[in-house]
Amino acid sequence: MREPGFWHRPPSLVSRLLLPIAAIYGNIAAARMQKAGTTVGVPVLCVGNYHMGGAGKTPTTLALVALLREFGETPVVLSRGYGGRLQGPVQVDPSRHSAADIGDEPLMMARRLAVVVARDRTDGAALACALGATVILMDDGFQNPALTKDASLIVVDSHRSIGNGSVFPAGPLRAPLPLQVARTDALVVVGDGAAADGLAQQITTKGGVVLRARLVPEPASVEALRGRRVLAFAGIGDPARFVATLRGSGVEVVEQRAFADHHPFTAEELAELAAAAKRDGLTLVTTEKDLARIGRAQQALGVEIVPFAVTLAFGDEAKLRLFLLDRLNGARAAKLAGRR
């Protein structure tokens, strides 16, 4: 869905008119969040958002995977598979699954590690354990109570933060903020903006950890676009951030097209993009997530679509390492004590 503009502006008449519905939605979401979950035999780390839309969960998940592997862990990502038709539980296989089957983010991540898609997260966790997981990384699912989480890391964009701070549909929040803050163990603030500073202070005050991070373009992606004029397009939570990252890397963005998050590109839309690129002598560039969703349809266009890959770099990686090790050790000690 495309986010309404009023979600990211000071409270307006529209948002105020929607507050009664937001109160009902918030009460239901809060009651659901507080339900008891199933305890899994391995640590469960959740990477989530307070709000609808994207803020960098997937790059954060992949960065955590890299660190966990350095610790000698075998992480398996568990995803709901948003946008896919399969109920699961199923291990994602990039050679036979498409984004229409299991969602764009799971497909993209499955090229790098084991990913399980399941609508029922308890069943998904069982499959992840059967695959040899020593740690389960939930990609999204912070508000879902199905599994007991040993640590919840919430990702927020430093420029957009949580918008107007209201619960859906008056604003972008998935549940009342105080409840979500209370259940947060670490806040990952992506970027160098100040919009999330107040939120970070709330997390610090309650004893949580605040981690600063930034999206760093992969050198190969920057090199592939050197000297080219590009038409950038993206169907992600914040397409403007994608364009800003391109320009910040020295890429000459001549044209840009924004689509809703998880947008299913039609053949007509792709053909129009290809025609515009050919007409103006531009190179099409998009995100890895969008390219996963486009899939084999790219082959019929007659033009190249260059994926622009980014990774998440933490400002204080030692702080993150200590946090992860503490949570992993604490989770294992608690699970061991529970078996006695």
UniProtKB/Swiss-Prot annotation:
Keyword Cell inner membrane: no
GO molecular function (one): tetraacyldisaccharide 4'-kinase activity
Gene giving rise to this polypeptide: lpxK
Matching HAMAP family: LpxK (MF_00409)
UniProt key word RNA-binding: no
Annotated GO biological process: lipid A biosynthetic process; lipopolysaccharide core region biosynthetic process
Source organism superkingdom: Bacteria
EC identifiers of the protein: 2.7.1.130
Pfam family, one: LpxK
Known pathway: Glycolipid biosynthesis; lipid IV(A) biosynthesis; lipid IV(A) from (3R)-3-hydroxytetradecanoyl-[acyl-carrier-protein] and UDP-N-acetyl-alpha-D-glucosamine: step 6/6
SUPFAM superfamilies: P-loop containing nucleoside triphosphate hydrolases
Residues annotated for ATP binding in this entry: H51, M52, G53, G54, A55, G56, K57, T58
Cellular component GO terms held in the UniProt record: plasma membrane
Full protein name: Tetraacyldisaccharide 4'-kinase
Catalytic reaction equation(s): a lipid A disaccharide + ATP = a lipid IVA + ADP + H(+)
Record family assignment: Belongs to the LpxK family.
Annotated function: Transfers the gamma-phosphate of ATP to the 4'-position of a tetraacyldisaccharide 1-phosphate intermediate (termed DS-1-P) to form tetraacyldisaccharide 1,4'-bis-phosphate (lipid IVA).
UniProt keyword annotations, A-Z: ATP-binding, Kinase, Lipid A biosynthesis, Lipid biosynthesis, Lipid metabolism, Nucleotide-binding, Transferase
